[in-house]
């Protein structure tokens, strides 16, 4: 679920940036998404959005699905059995790892999405 995703982000980035910093970034980080991603980090969010969309098509509810995971050496790893829990966990873990690698550009936080995300 979204709280677990926030915790995964903290695991992957070693707590260097609050999870909420990603909630309103670029065109895809946060609710919804459209247009061309503004940078590598925004592409991570677009991929995560697409993963959640695939989960929804499988009958899962990714924002609410509770799964089992652990933080091992700054890498989130999923422990859930196959099915919705494992699928959603994999979406979140991949995104958290992607966020940790991508540069965070303050100028892409809280942008005017109506102008920049066409």
Curated annotation (Swiss-Prot):
<feature type="binding site">
    <location>
        <position position="49"/>
    </location>
    <ligand>
        <name>Ca(2+)</name>
    </ligand>
</feature>
<keyword id="KW-0479">Metal-binding</keyword>
<dbReference type="GO" id="GO:0006644">
    <property type="term" value="P:phospholipid metabolic process"/>
</dbReference>
<dbReference type="Pfam" id="PF00068">
    <property type="entry name" value="Phospholip_A2_1"/>
</dbReference>
<feature type="binding site">
    <location>
        <position position="30"/>
    </location>
    <ligand>
        <name>Ca(2+)</name>
    </ligand>
</feature>
<keyword id="KW-0964">Secreted</keyword>
<dbReference type="GO" id="GO:0016042">
    <property type="term" value="P:lipid catabolic process"/>
</dbReference>
<dbReference type="GO" id="GO:0047498">
    <property type="term" value="F:calcium-dependent phospholipase A2 activity"/>
</dbReference>
<feature type="binding site">
    <location>
        <position position="32"/>
    </location>
    <ligand>
        <name>Ca(2+)</name>
    </ligand>
</feature>
<feature type="disulfide bond">
    <location>
        <begin position="78"/>
        <end position="89"/>
    </location>
</feature>
<feature type="disulfide bond">
    <location>
        <begin position="11"/>
        <end position="71"/>
    </location>
</feature>
<feature type="disulfide bond">
    <location>
        <begin position="60"/>
        <end position="84"/>
    </location>
</feature>
<keyword id="KW-0378">Hydrolase</keyword>
<feature type="disulfide bond">
    <location>
        <begin position="29"/>
        <end position="45"/>
    </location>
</feature>
<dbReference type="InterPro" id="IPR033113">
    <property type="entry name" value="PLipase_A2_His_AS"/>
</dbReference>
<keyword id="KW-0443">Lipid metabolism</keyword>
<keyword id="KW-1015">Disulfide bond</keyword>
<feature type="disulfide bond">
    <location>
        <begin position="44"/>
        <end position="98"/>
    </location>
</feature>
<dbReference type="GO" id="GO:0005576">
    <property type="term" value="C:extracellular region"/>
</dbReference>
<feature type="binding site">
    <location>
        <position position="28"/>
    </location>
    <ligand>
        <name>Ca(2+)</name>
    </ligand>
</feature>
<feature type="disulfide bond">
    <location>
        <begin position="51"/>
        <end position="91"/>
    </location>
</feature>
<dbReference type="InterPro" id="IPR033112">
    <property type="entry name" value="PLipase_A2_Asp_AS"/>
</dbReference>
<dbReference type="InterPro" id="IPR036444">
    <property type="entry name" value="PLipase_A2_dom_sf"/>
</dbReference>
<comment type="similarity">
    <text>Belongs to the phospholipase A2 family. Group I subfamily. D49 sub-subfamily.</text>
</comment>
<feature type="active site">
    <location>
        <position position="92"/>
    </location>
</feature>
<keyword id="KW-0442">Lipid degradation</keyword>
<dbReference type="InterPro" id="IPR001211">
    <property type="entry name" value="PLipase_A2"/>
</dbReference>
<dbReference type="InterPro" id="IPR016090">
    <property type="entry name" value="PLipase_A2_dom"/>
</dbReference>
<feature type="active site">
    <location>
        <position position="48"/>
    </location>
</feature>
<protein>
    <recommendedName>
        <fullName>Basic phospholipase A2 PA-12C</fullName>
        <ecNumber>3.1.1.4</ecNumber>
    </recommendedName>
</protein>
<dbReference type="GO" id="GO:0005509">
    <property type="term" value="F:calcium ion binding"/>
</dbReference>
<comment type="function">
    <text>PLA2 catalyzes the calcium-dependent hydrolysis of the 2-acyl groups in 3-sn-phosphoglycerides.</text>
</comment>
<dbReference type="GO" id="GO:0050482">
    <property type="term" value="P:arachidonate secretion"/>
</dbReference>
<keyword id="KW-0106">Calcium</keyword>
<dbReference type="GO" id="GO:0005543">
    <property type="term" value="F:phospholipid binding"/>
</dbReference>
<feature type="disulfide bond">
    <location>
        <begin position="27"/>
        <end position="117"/>
    </location>
</feature>
